[in-house]
Structure formats: structure tokens, C-alpha cells
Amino acid sequence: DKLYYESLTNKKLKVDKKKLFVKLKKDKEKRLLTIEDNGIGMTESELSENLGTIAKSGSLAFKEGLTKEDKINIIGQFGVGFYSSFMVADKVCVESKKTGCDAYKWVSKGVSGYEIEKIDKSDVGTKITLHIKENTEGENYDEFLEEFKIQALIKKYSDYVTYPIKMETKDEKTGKETLNEYIKNNPSRDKRFKE
């Protein structure tokens, strides 16, 4: 939504709302869960400001800047949602590129700070990679790499997301990868898709 709203005032941004997406990919062997979008992306300073500060919410600041007519639901508006990733991951990497800017990678183990470095990334948007923790005697983190668990979490926490949420899956028998859409664009849910 941030990209769409910025495109209304920035004529350099060309946004086809029907091509915006959120994509998930899991790798059980490497214990990785990746969430990627082709949204607005973040600059180096935005990564530091929005992810490097607990309870700092760039989403909330964006939402507060809208007019009353611009009713919108924004994920992460309280600034602590992102940090819940460290409940299941021992390391989080965020790669992001904003239009017209360099791309950067933010990395943290959730314990003592973070690192940011410049990277090569041509596509605008953000990719978050969670390095899922190993199981312990009391916790089964494997479930966060199971398709049914991920699908249930998507439906529970992201039902209001306007854009499609897709997940790459691999058929264990054939090895073929497919892209399944869990939440389809629901035009009745959002008037912007009726244009």
C-alpha cells in the first residue's frame, strides 16, 4: 500500500496494483523461511530506523501521514511485530531496495545489535529470510517450516492483506516446484481493485 500511495504523488513510480504480491518460500533442509514482496522497499537509513529500533514503526508513521479519507490497514504499525520473528528464528536477514536507491542487507541475531551492508539487488522490494531455530526439548520449531502451519498462520494473521500471498512449494515425490496462492485478491474487500 505504501508503494501505491507514493505513486500518486511521485510520477516516476509506475505501479500496477494487480502485479503487487507477497511470496513465501521454505527450505526445510537449510531451515529457512523467506518472505518477499515487490513493494516500496527501504533505504539504508529506513532499515536502520525501522528495524534497528525496537517499537519504532515506519508503518505507523506512514499511516498517521494519511488523510481521514485514506483508510488503510498497515501491518507492523506498532513496531514490535517484526521482533516476534526472533521467537522462531536465531537470525534474520532483510534485503531491501527502494526505487532509485542502492540495495542494502540488514542482519541481526536479535541479541546484540545489527549489521547493514550494501548489496547487489536489482528488483525493488523487500526479502526477509528467517533462519529457523533448531528444535529444543520443549519447542518444535520444525512446524514453522510445514506448509499447513504456514498456511494457517497466513490465514489467521493476514486475511486483511489486499494483495495476493503466494507460497512456493515442492512436491516431495516429483521435485516439481509450484506457486500456490493462499489469499487471493478480494475485490469486494478493497474498492481500489474496482478501478
Please identify what each model-predicted range represents.
Residues 116-195:
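ATP-binding catalytic core of ATPases
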